Amino acid sequence: RTSSSAASDVYKRQLSNSEAHYLSTGPEIWEQMGGRIDHFVVGVGTGGTISGVGRFLKEKNNKIKIWGIDSFGSIFKKYHETGEFDKNEIYPYLTEGIGEDILPENVDFKIIDHFEKVTDENAAIYARRLAKKEGILAGYSCGAAIAGLHQLKSNFKKNENVVVLLHDSGTRYIGKVYNDEWMKKQGFKLD
């Protein structure tokens, strides 16, 4: 059997995922922001959100920058920069929901301006900060998105509007990211 006929190929080929974000999430963001968007920042896993929303936003205003957040241990950033699928970039990481060791067909690398890699530790720390300082119990990939936002801040001008999409809830991470013992076991500092 070919990989495209195997059941495991479902994950790689979620093309309706991207289309759903093009038809719903992208227009919703555009409308809520009144079209005043300069940057869109989001974690990248299957690629559906960044590709669908990114395509919609670029069609509205091709000057909008699309920033993908990636994990160390994932291949997206290097592939985007070089076109090379480098197996040496692939190694285990903890952040769930972003990064890949495959190239999902959903990821439209042409509309993504830049990938920013975030460490597992920073993703966890920023998820915890969101809960502590903003009252948002967000997931691990959301922490990565916020950590990436902070790493990218020198790319944003003072009066520009930056939209960051937070994908998941922190309820799945109560025993991990939000657990001090888990953080210590990983060697992560407590914030």
Regions found by a protein language model. Name each.
Residues 20-65:
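Glycine-rich ThDP/TPP pyrophosphate-binding loop and its adjacent helix/strand module
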Residues 44-54, 76, 141-149:
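Short glycine/serine/threonine-rich phosphate/pyrophosphate-binding segments
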Residues 1-7, 11:
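Single conserved hydrophobic/aromatic residue that forms the stacking wall/gate
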Residues 39, 136-140, 144-146, 150-152, ...:
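Terminal helix/beta-alpha structural elements that buttress the NAD(P)+-binding lobe
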Residues 59-140, 177-191:
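Active-site/ligand-binding loops adjacent to catalytic centers
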